[in-house]
Amino acid sequence: MIREAIIKLSQKQDLTYEEAEQVMNEIMEGQATDVQKSSYLTALSMKGETIDEITASAAGMRAHCIKLLHNMDVLEALGVKIDLPPERSAELLKEIQICFLFAQNYHIAMKYVAPIRKELGIRTVFNILGPLSNPAGANMELMGVYEQELVEPLAQVMAKLGVVRGMVVYGQDKLDEISMSAPTSVCEIRDGWFQSYEITPEQFGYTRCSKEELVGGTPEENAEITKEILRGEERGGKRCAVCLNAGAAIYIAGKAQSMEEGVRMAEQIIDDGRALKKLEQFVEESRK
């Protein structure tokens, strides 16, 4: 199928859902050659992915992952053991309501495309498939994207994959998260209903900061910044960025009636020490 798909894509024709899923199955099962995989990913990227092509690719990738992934380097620097087996991660999620899913332990079939992606050096559909292929099968999700044009299409993809409450965000200063230095484009999902809108830091009582103020450093430096935020020592733009994104997640999870309420809850959880306590618990339990 991959040969036929490459020809079709090179002619700027869209693949059907079934064709895209079949190609992904061939790739994930090691049936495609390196040349075929490279040609397919390049042709798909050059044509531009449709909603059906992304949805089918994510479904195919999900089918090949171990069931039950922003930065694992920071978690490691904080002391979290990140490469736990799936069974232990599932236990942590049940016992303390938090875990980290190390991609290499779940998306084993990615070994067939990882070298190709590195050599190509361009963004491909796999850049967005990871968050869409959550091994836990979460039906509530906050996802950041790297291009404005992906916001609404990926919200539709998430809904087709079973997400009932979700939010796709793009910081207009080219951040794949809710930004403290620019407006953020949002597409919210609720039981098959979509709403697109824009939010700004000022809506939540925050003073906009420069993008440079949010830049981190080494994993160790970022881990220290994280601790300063959770200890209540950092009260500038970095803390506000954390509260905005955590607040959105709290709202999407149904724990707040609005994002405004979610942001206020995030602030309170930091201020009363619950967030720091949860991190310390996560570190301790992950190392048992």
Language-model-derived ranges and their functions:
Residues 8, 14-15, 63-66, 70, ...:
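Glycine-rich anion-binding loops and their surrounding alpha/beta cores
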Residues 1, 9-70, 241:
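N-terminal glycine-rich anion-binding loops that anchor highly charged ligand groups
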